[in-house]
Amino acid sequence: MATAEVLNIGKKLYEGKTKEVYELLDSPGKVLLQSKDQITAGNAARKNHLEGKAAISNKITSCIFQLLQEAGIKTAFTRKCGETAFIAPQCEMIPIEWVCRRIATGSFLKRNPGVKEGYKFYPPKVELFFKDDANNDPQWSEEQLIAAKFCFAGLLIGQTEVDIMSHATQAIFEILEKSWLPQNCTLVDMKIEFGVDVTTKEIVLADVIDNDSWRLWPSGDRSQQKDKQSYRDLKEVTPEGLQMVKKNFEWVAERVELLLKSESQCRVVVLMGSTSDLGHCEKIKKACGNFGIPCELRVTSAHKGPDETLRIKAEYEGDGIPTVFVAVAGRSNGLGPVMSGNTAYPVISCPPLTPDWGVQDVWSSLRLPSGLGCSTVLSPEGSAQFAAQIFGLSNHLVWSKLRASILNTWISLKQADKKIRECNL
């Protein structure tokens, strides 16, 4: 029988409308976020006790943060702790709500007369609002945020930091939007917050993402909304109305775990012409692992054993798992073209070129007979990424890792540029 975890909880650091934050005396730099059985709307102008909401909110946040972390998004989340709390790195919160919208609805329509409900934003529209309950969280411009000269955990919030949060908001929305699609749910909009990790001094996604944080429409139908808007829309709060709201929240909590899995399988099979190319192939396998894609290595030569090459091909075609073949053959590459001419599956040639004959050898991968769709990628890591992009069309987990990688590359360049500029001062 499992025993309940005992934490050495210190003082209360913060209390909001729906959660409390406590220090953890035995874990410096970590805090406990405890959810409440409370639901609010209109900056708590409407407020009700909702039994079980804390557990529902905690489950949703824990699953969403796990999904984002596994994708590669920097997130203030360590692990779930019991039914109603989770442990996270301690952050100094930036008092801005970042809103990302795919579909125009709600307050956006009030602030932008003439825009019809249902208008779609490409790319998603990012807005920011200063957290100030007394003034109903006024909308801010990026310039206002920069002019405020906020400093949290020693980090001054300037143009670079604002750009990072803006780009991260869009990436996070797109990952969650893509993740809800297999459940036939449209993510209409969402709001998130960032903080500065007091230990690493990095900007990270923080606070919570639960059913209070977004609009979620099954089948893209507003009348089926399952988010907190169903509570806001109540003309009068009754026990029956609250029960309906709770059922909506439970519906989301039941499905959010499904976002951590994908019904679409995927696999990369690397065919090498010789074990002398094993090092090259292992780089491909390692890169596939970074995208969560299973990868198998096989040895076969299309020149010396074409019958065995085609038998291996048939083996993988026969089990029904979506597969991308990567052909690794030096000198004259017959492996990629032979595979491409005999399978409807994608084939990528990734020849291990050598300094002496590489310039000549590469033409066996580039100049092919008509009717072959074999692509050529020279980088082992690049061939794995290309395979991931193929699978990402139908697998939201792979796509999420690709999207987070794009964001993280952009952030690293932005931070490198900031560092260089500071050195020039």
From Swiss-Prot:
It holds the Pfam family SAICAR_synt. The modification N-acetylalanine is found at residue 2. One of its GO terms (cellular component) is cytoplasm. One of its GO terms (molecular function) is ATP binding. CO2 binds at residue 332. GO terms for biological process: 'de novo' AMP biosynthetic process; 'de novo' IMP biosynthetic process; 'de novo' XMP biosynthetic process; GMP biosynthetic process; purine nucleobase biosynthetic process. Changing residue 400 to A: No effect on phosphoribosylaminoimidazole carboxylase activity. Changing residue 53 to R: In PAICSD; uncertain significance; no effect on protein abundance; decreased phosphoribosylaminoimidazole carboxylase activity; decreased phosphoribosylaminoimidazolesuccinocarboxamide synthase activity. PROSITE patterns: SAICAR_SYNTHETASE_1, SAICAR_SYNTHETASE_2. This is Bifunctional phosphoribosylaminoimidazole carboxylase/phosphoribosylaminoimidazole succinocarboxamide synthetase. The gene is PAICS.
